[in-house]
Design a protein with these regions (language model features):
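Short beta-loop-alpha junction of Rossmann-like oxidoreductase domains
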Residues: 126-128, 178-180, 184, 285
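Residue-level signal for the nucleotide or nucleotide-sugar donor/cofactor binding architecture
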Residues: 36, 58, 87, 95-98, ...
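Residues in well-ordered alpha-helical elements
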Residues: 61-64, 71, 83, 90, ...
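Hydrophobic alpha-helix immediately C-terminal to the catalytic Tyr-X-X-X-Lys motif of short-chain
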Residues: 151, 155, 159, 188, ...
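A glycine/serine/threonine-rich, flexible loop-to-helix segment
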Residues: 130-131, 182-191, 252
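C-terminal substrate-binding subdomain of Rossmann-fold SDR/epimerase-dehydratase oxidoreductases
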Residues: 193-320
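N-terminal Rossmann-like NAD(P)+-binding domain of SDR-like oxidoreductases, especially those catalyzing
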Residues: 1-175
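Hydrophobic pocket-lining residues that define ligand/cofactor binding sites across diverse proteins
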Residues: 107, 160, 192, 224-225
């Protein structure tokens, strides 16, 4: 099997590639390396199990070149900074919606039959019931990132209906873990690295969401694809519970050893424009396939904090 992974040098993509290579696939990594890291996939490049195409998925000709001879696409590339869309408003249009069009059109022209798409819980918006099932609708996202993910789902669904491809759409909870390059835990650790005496938290700390460990996420993708064979397959991927931003701050302060740090809240019920204060995905459909997660939200947070502290070198630097 020849698999194309967009964003493959990134956080989730590199973990997925580890598993694809382990099962014997050859992987073509399509990544512009704007936020990805070669070190995440270097072993696979060195041993010939993966090939890097350093290109931008917003450029159709470059996508076409990478698509030749591919059997299955894992489309994970997107704007990694949700807040950026509030300042540069065409970011998600270009890196999300139009890039997804380039992917599915290049698939059509190269007779590639299957795509797995990384969507997000943010497509549901903030008025959905909790936990939110896949059947909830209409989806009314409140961020430009969420709008681009919903548009990507629509494009893929239309390619299924019009051109007969097979698609797996995965709506992710908040994915965290080793190799993380952004997100609340990453941000908190860097803030404490800069100033161990205080930790600023955006919002009131009561925002509460589901967190899924990245290895669980990658395993869930491949498990669902192995046992679900409809033309269009839609699954929420998440954990059984939630954790608050306040609790995340407490765990990060504890694991970094910055016990004297004061946790200071900026106020308000959301961290930024477009942030959803409370989110929890219904995962009964995922569980019905026989897959379950290894970590609950708090366990995933603690595991991630410890891993990122080591990766960032926080304790070494603070103790030197």
């Amino acid at each position: 099997m020849r698999a194309l992974v967009t964003g493959g040098a990134g956080f989730i993509g590199s973990h997925l590639i580890d598993r694809l290579v382990a099962r014997g696939d050859h992987v073509v990594v399509l990544d512009n390396l704007s936020s990805g890291h070669l070190s995440f996939i270097q072993e696979h490049l060195d041993n010939g199990n993966a090939t890097l195409v350093q290109a931008d998925i917003t450029q159709f000709d470059e996508v076409m070149g990478a698509m030749k001879g591919i059997d299955c696409v894992y489309h994970l590339a997107a704007n990694p900074d949700i807040r950026l869309g509030t300042r540069i408003t065409d970011t998600d249009l270009k890196q999300g919606t139009l890039a997804t069009y380039n992917i599915v059109e290049a698939m059509r022209l190269n007779n590639v039959g299957t795509i797995a798409f990384a969507s997000s819980s943010v497509v549901y918006g903030e008025d959905a019931p909790l936990p939110t099932p896949e059947s909830h609708g209409p989806c009314m996202p409140i961020s430009l990132y969420g709008a681009s993910k919903q548009a990507g789902e629509g494009l893929i669904s239309s390619w299924v209906g019009t051109f007969g491809i097979q698609a797996y759409i995965f709506r992710f909870a908040n994915i965290i873990g080793t190799r993380g390059t952004h997100g609340v835990i990453f941000d908190f650790i860097h803030k404490l690295k800069k100033d161990p005496s205080r930790l600023e938290v955006l919002g009131n700390g009561l925002q509460e969401k589901s967190y899924m460990e990245v290895g669980d996420c990658a395993d869930a993708i491949l498990h669902v694809m192995s046992c679900s064979n409809d033309s269009l397959n839609l699954y929420n991927l998440g954990s059984h519970d939630t954790a608050s931003v306040r609790r995340i701050a407490e765990i990060v302060v504890e694991t970094t050893g910055c016990h004297d740090a004061s946790i200071e809240y900026t106020g308000g019920d959301r961290g930024w424009a477009g942030d959803i204060p409370r989110a929890m995905l219904g995962i009964e459909k995922m569980l019905s396939t026989g897959f379950d997660v290894r970590y609950n939200s708090e366990e995933a947070i603690r595991h991630t904090a410890l891993a990122l502290i080591e990766e960032i070198g926080l304790n070494t630097e603070m103790n030197s």
